[in-house]
Amino acid sequence: IYDPIVGFDLLVFPHPTSPSKAHLLGTDPLGRDVLSMFLAGSGPLIRLSIFSFFIGISISLFLGTTIPFIFKRTDLIFKEISSGLILISPPIILLILGTGDFTDILTPSSVGIIYGILSGLGVCYLVVRSAVIEISNQEFINASKLLGGKNLYIATRHIMPVVVPYAVSYMLASTTYGILAYGFASFYGQVGWTPNWGMMIYDAITYGSYLGGTNYWNLI
């Protein structure tokens, strides 16, 4: 395993080279091992995914369960906010933030927080909300009310466990789009500098055009 930033194999020339036993995914135009770069770029994306998933699912589950069931008037406001957030593309938001003084603080963790908030308050909230409205009219909820159960207790103990699969399934899919959004913004240099797949694609195209053609195994 070579250093993903400054690693250079002096025994291999010229660069880029095709996949071999020494370099399973070949080298890029600067002589760096593509596999090492790929593995180094996976760590930040894993952190992004973890932050995005848990923040998004926490927001969507708590707000999506309690507000439609307990605060019905407030739910009308949140519904409009969520509908508006659906129209906002996370890659565009990252590009806008990256054009200012926020580039250095747009780390994978902070991007995961931003994307988790957008996803949790966006489509995921509406998905959980629709499930809560449907469940709140079922017989076991009415029975719990007749027995004197408080709304917060019913929402957290009876309704929330039922809607968890809805939130989990959507956030798992949404996290994938978060990775794509970060790679997209990184390709244009609008996020903090860190090894990632977006920069690998950028280097493959940019340096390849100057130093002997694009190495397509890097792009793949």
Predicted regions and their residues:
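Generic hydrophobic transmembrane alpha-helix motif, especially the helices
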Residues: L24, D28, R32, I55, ...
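Membrane-helix/interface signature in polytopic inner-membrane proteins
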Residues: Y125-K145, K150-N151
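Transmembrane alpha-helix boundary and packing residues in multipass membrane permease domains
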Residues: T65, L95-T99, V111, N142, ...
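Glycine-rich helix-loop "coupling/hinge" segments at transmembrane-helix boundaries
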Residues: I86, G100, A181-I220
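C-terminal transmembrane helix and the adjacent membrane-cytosol boundary/short C-terminal tail
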Residues: T103, Y115-S119, M171-L172, L211-I220
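Short helix-to-coil transition segments within interhelical loops
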Residues: T27-R32, I70, A143-V162
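Transmembrane alpha-helices
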Residues: G43-I59, L152-A185
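Gly/Trp-centered helix-boundary motif
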Residues: I1-L61, T65-T66, K72-L76, L87-P91, ...
